[in-house]
Amino acid sequence: MTELNRVVAHFTDGKLLKGTTQDFFPNRPRFHLQPAAGGAPVEVRCRSLKALFFVKEFVGNASRRDLRGFLNSPGETAQGKKIAVRFKDGELLCGYSLSYLPDREGFFMFPSDSGSNNLRIYVIAAATVEVKAGPSADVLAQKVLATRPE
């Protein structure tokens, strides 16, 4: 039996779609998403995505503030090496990845904030402007966060 995953699809045009999927595989160009609001399944083309967030719940805690950057996180964990991702829309994600390779179409990462509603995130490389792994991930995160108010 295939696992049912709760996901939030973030599209490059800014649209969000919440639902479940059983057929997402990183090596396939499309998958089906059953909208949380009901209705017929939607075919999602990966090239139209910014990222696919695998979440604990569809309704997050609105009063919770996500931790910014890496704080005092170790350089490497069981979830991989530090990675900082800056998207074309300016969003910064910090976390860990076991599977990042610069020439791939995408990669999985785990959030650096263990209290996050996100379990893991599949990042579409074409939606990024900068990805840094290892010690340079800290440098990128600090650079981007220094230009933003808390």
Residue ranges of predicted features:
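Conserved RNA-binding domains used in RNP assembly and mRNA/RNA metabolism
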Residues: 1-150
